[in-house]
């Protein structure tokens, strides 16, 4: 049903953009069921995050046009977020993302692991989904790209495992840059855990 709905929306010329209602699981299941010829012939924005990463990456590999890693429709949005996405989806012939960062974004703690200037295609999303699609035909080429990643409810050792998978597959070594975003509740709840912290895992994989 989800694949049929998505195919219908991309075949309908009256539909300007497709907003995912929520994330969760299962987006990868529908990839072989999508009409990629119709999707390529009818470009329109796909907006969502989390499990929707599977669709974003497949679109980057198969459709040839960008999508938006942004809020799902069921999320609670600030007014500036909704206004920005509305302009992107409906108010411009050529979508352009711009403007100053909002208060929430500009006030967050950030640190630089490896300094410098990078330019490249922006690819990524949920780290679990990125690593799950490794070795399939649904990933775009990462050479020269800037990879952004986020995740939720994953223990430090699982984050380490997924980053190690990207390293062993050669992905980390061919990137122009990496942005490691929010990792909500990414800590183990196992009693007596004495492994690496999340910061240590990130530094081990991304530091010079």
Annotate the PLM regions.
Residues 1-14:
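ATP/NTP phosphate-donor binding region
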Residues 14, 39-45, 63-65, 175-176, ...:
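A short helix->loop->beta-strand "cap" motif at the edges of active sites that frequently abuts
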Residues 17-28, 33, 49:
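N-terminal glycine-rich "phosphate-gripper" loop used for MgATP/nucleotide binding
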Residues 34-58, 66-73:
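Short, acidic/small-residue loops that bind anionic groups at enzyme active sites
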Residues 64-131, 135:
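Conserved anion/nucleotide-ligand pocket segment
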Residues 122-166:
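Oxyanion-binding "anion nests"
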Residues 162-208:
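C-terminal active-site/capping subdomain that shapes the small-molecule cofactor and substrate pocket
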């Amino acid at each position: 049903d989800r694949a049929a709905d998505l195919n219908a929306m991309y075949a309908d010329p009256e539909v300007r953009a497709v907003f995912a209602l929520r994330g969760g699981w299962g987006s990868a299941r529908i990839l072989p069921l999508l009409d990629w010829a119709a999707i390529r012939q009818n470009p329109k924005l796909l907006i969502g995050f989390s499990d929707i990463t599977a669709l974003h990456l497949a679109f980057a590999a198969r459709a040839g046009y960008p999508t938006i890693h942004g809020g799902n429709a069921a999320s609670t949005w600030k007014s500036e977020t909704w206004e920005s996405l509305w302009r992107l989806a409906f108010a411009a012939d050529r979508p352009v993302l711009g403007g100053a960062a909002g208060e929430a974004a500009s006030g967050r703690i950030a640190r630089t692991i490896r300094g410098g200037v990078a330019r490249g295609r922006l690819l990524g999303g949920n780290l679990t989904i990125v690593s799950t699609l490794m070795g399939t035909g649904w990933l775009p080429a990462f050479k020269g790209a800037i990879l952004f990643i986020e995740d939720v409810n994953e223990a430090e050792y699982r984050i380490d495992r997924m980053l190690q998978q990207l390293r062993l597959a050669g992905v980390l070594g061919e990137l122009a840059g990496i942005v490691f975003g929010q990792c909500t509740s990414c800590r183990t709840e196992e009693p007596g855990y004495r492994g690496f912290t999340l910061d240590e895992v990130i530094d081990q994989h991304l530091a010079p």
